């Protein structure tokens, strides 16, 4: 059985919080797949936490240069994702979000097909 300290160490490593070898915001977001960014500054912090010595401008530069974009591929929640992955993520996940929102659409008098 694993010790709780080992579990904590593995989680920190796998989440790129400790011991990362990644060098820039894009590599972090690619490795994680997405970073939750419903709160913009919280999303920036989530990336910066994983890049010791990085500056906010480094992350914002990746956004300005469209290496990373902020979109809502999962659960209707905003995330930072690699720009080159956004299309397939949205194509894969949007139908599920729409299905799960059907009740709310009906309440609002919206038609999914419109």
Regions found by a protein language model. Give the residues of each.
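Phosphate-backbone binding and catalysis cores of DNA-processing enzymes
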Residues: 1-114
């Amino acid at each position: 059985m694993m010790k709780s300290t080992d579990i904590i160490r593995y989680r920190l490593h796998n989440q790129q919080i400790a011991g990362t070898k990644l060098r820039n915001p894009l590599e972090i977001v690619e490795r994680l797949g997405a970073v939750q960014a419903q709160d913009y500054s919280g999303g920036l912090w989530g990336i910066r936490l994983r890049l010791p010595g990085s500056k906010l401008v480094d992350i914002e530069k990746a956004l300005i240069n469209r290496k990373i974009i902020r979109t809502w591929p999962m659960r209707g929640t905003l995330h930072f994702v690699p720009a080159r992955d956004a299309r397939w993520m949205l194509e894969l996940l949007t139908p599920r979000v729409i299905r799960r929102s059907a009740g709310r659409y009906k309440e609002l008098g919206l038609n999914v097909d419109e």
